């Protein structure tokens, strides 16, 4: 279990509850709940900042959600964040309908089978996670040759950087893949799995 309590809706202030509900969206249930946000709810201002960052990078922008989910797995795997990788595995398999064998290849860092556009984004995201100072003109030229422009590059950087931060929070707070069931015991559980960010 995490180093902090996950804030439950019935114990949250109105402001915190509103932020968490905005993330969950209209569907309700536990499918869109984020253990990361529930942990950060112990500090409402930080929760609000992280919510805004996640909302703008994951749900906003012009790059498609499939690519952002791919980037989230690449970064989380590079950072060895088991919880984040597991969460986004569900997103890729269920929301994006990525075949399991393709996910496993991405998880293993085998990007050659990906289309050029995804391969370039995956390699860029991995470098952001592991060696951001190593991003040079050659790395950018590879990205641009795959059809990205400067706005796309900055958005990819934003998504990758957001997940570097999320991985750090998740690991430092010791949020584990098995925490979900215990954290939401007694909550509405009509759906299983996580769906939006590093839970």
Residue ranges, per PLM feature:
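Secretory/endomembrane lumenal or extracellular ectodomains immediately following the signal peptide
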Residues: 1-67, 100, 178-199
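Alpha-helical scaffolds flanking conserved acidic
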Residues: 64-72, 152-153
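Preference for long, well-ordered alpha-helical segments
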Residues: 150-190
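Amphipathic, charged-and-aliphatic alpha-helical interface segments
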Residues: 71-75, 116-135, 159-160
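A contiguous pocket-lining binding segment that forms or flanks enzyme active sites
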Residues: 105-126, 146
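Short, thiol/selenol-centered motifs that function as redox-active sites or metal-ligating centers
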Residues: 71-91, 160
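Iron-sulfur (Fe-S) cluster-binding segments and ferredoxin-like electron-carrier domains
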Residues: 47, 85-103, 176
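Acidic interhelical loop/turn segments
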Residues: 134-154
